[in-house]
Curated annotation (Swiss-Prot):
Superkingdom per UniProt: Bacteria
Source organism per UniProt: Shewanella baltica (strain OS185)
Transmembrane segments: 2-22
MF terms in GO: protein transmembrane transporter activity
Name of the protein this chain belongs to: Sec-independent protein translocase protein TatB
Lineage, top ranks: Bacteria, Pseudomonadati, Pseudomonadota, Gammaproteobacteria, Alteromonadales
Compartments in which it is found: Cell inner membrane
Keywords annotated in UniProt: Cell inner membrane, Cell membrane, Membrane, Protein transport, Translocation, Transmembrane, Transmembrane helix, Transport
Function: Part of the twin-arginine translocation (Tat) system that transports large folded proteins containing a characteristic twin-arginine motif in their signal peptide across membranes. Together with TatC, TatB is part of a receptor directly interacting with Tat signal peptides. TatB may form an oligomeric binding site that transiently accommodates folded Tat precursor proteins before their translocation.
Primary gene name: tatB
Chain spans, region Disordered: 69-171
Record field: compositional bias (Low complexity): 114-130, 138-158
GO cellular component assignments: TAT protein transport complex
InterPro entries the UniProt entry points to: TatA/B/E (IPR003369), TatB (IPR018448)
One Pfam family recorded for the sequence: TatA_B_E
């Protein structure tokens, strides 16, 4: 671990650490330094593993190119094995994700206490947007649509209008 550092150098570092940090803070400092070293080693190992994986993929890809150039009939067993591994990796990547069906996940109607409505009606109501609902039922109208509303302020006061707020009408 300490290739270039001998026993005397380690002893000198320990004494200097004891003098600078003191006996209370030295164990905490040693623990934090060792945790940093462990984290660095873990990071280096993960990078190393990723590089090895990438190199293996590159090797498999190169073997596949060789197999294509030679033809698939007269291949060595090593190339056939690498082709099979590559095919399996491609199939695992291309495998579609399985989506859970919300209808299958709902409890059976006899187990439901709060809702006498069937589960198909509930799911159709949940997954329908207002635009889709209006397209599905064109006869349905919205009560307060802005296009059919009358103007908010009348241009002329009506005969039964309240005259208390209008000073000209009072006088």
């Amino acid at each position: 671990m300490f290739d270039g550092i001998g026993f005397m150098e380690l002893l000198l570092i320990g004494v200097l650490g004891l003098v600078v940090l003191g006996p209370e803070r030295l164990p905490v400092a040693v623990r934090s330094i060792t945790s940093w070293i462990r984290a660095m080693k873990r990071m280096a190992n993960s990078v190393k593993e990723e590089l090895e994986q990438e190199l293996k993929i590159e090797q498999l890809h190169a073997d596949l190119k060789k197999a294509e150039s030679k033809g698939l009939s007269n291949l060595s067993p090593e190339l056939k094995e690498s082709i099979e591994q590559l095919k399996q990796a491609a199939q695992s990547v291309n495998r579609p994700y399985q989506v859970q069906d919300p209808v299958k996940d709902t409890p059976a109607p006899e187990n439901q206490i709060h809702s006498p409505v069937s589960s198909t009606v509930q799911t159709s109501q949940v997954h329908t947007s207002p635009a889709q609902a209006s397209q599905a039922n064109p006869t349905a109208t919205v009560e307060a649509s802005p296009t059919s509303a009358s103007p908010a302020t009348p241009s002329e006061p009506s005969q039964g209008a309240d005259t208390r707020s209008n000073p000209k009408a009072n006088g």
